[in-house]
Amino acid sequence: MKLDIKGILLLAAIAVALAFFWLAPSDGLQAAPKAKMTTIDGEPIDLTELRGKPYMVVFWATDCPGCVKEIPHLRSLYNDLGKQGFRIIAVAMPHDEIPLIKTMREEKAMNYDIVFDEDGTLAKAFGGVKVTPTSFLISPEGKIALQKMGELDMDQVTQMLRDML
């Protein structure tokens, strides 16, 4: 049987186009999960109450080199924009341990909210996060404006935030 390459390519292109339109949210941006969590200091956070200002949720781990490399940049971003209402929530993955998380917070002067996702509920709520760092920038309207697996482009994030604030 002879393969018709043009036919296969056409079918593949149609399948990709259909999958894109079927999976894409209707307004182009997916709503952020309506999750509740508690910081490692016992402060409750309800993401639905953060509407009106942008915030970032960063899934990280103490044993993740890329995550540790991002900490000074996140700290600087929070220092620059926190007074305008911007918030960072760093979510430590289930394999981490509270003592290690607290030690890193002190050593790296992490001045933003830190949550321990002990049972993986938050990772599931954000689409099954398994890789760190994975970051979500949420718009003031509660939509996911940026989702990034791997280290962030801080210039891009800063510009997006300045446009939102």
PLM regions and their residue ranges:
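Thiol/disulfide oxidoreductase modules built on the thioredoxin-like
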Residues: 106-111, 118-163
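Short extracytoplasmic/periplasmic juxtamembrane "stem" segments immediately C-terminal to an N-terminal membrane anchor
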Residues: 33-51
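Hydrophobic beta-strand anchors of alpha/beta hydrolase catalytic cores
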Residues: 56-57, 88, 135
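Active-site acidic short loop of glycosyltransferases
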Residues: 51-53, 83, 111
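Structural microenvironment flanking redox-active thiols in thiol-disulfide oxidoreductases
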Residues: 68-108, 118-124
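Short active-site neighborhood of thiol/selenol oxidoreductases, capturing the structured segment around
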Residues: 47-65, 74
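N-terminal targeting signals for export/organelle localization
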Residues: 1-38
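Short loop/turn microsegments at loop-to-beta-strand junctions
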Residues: 32-33, 54-55, 132-133
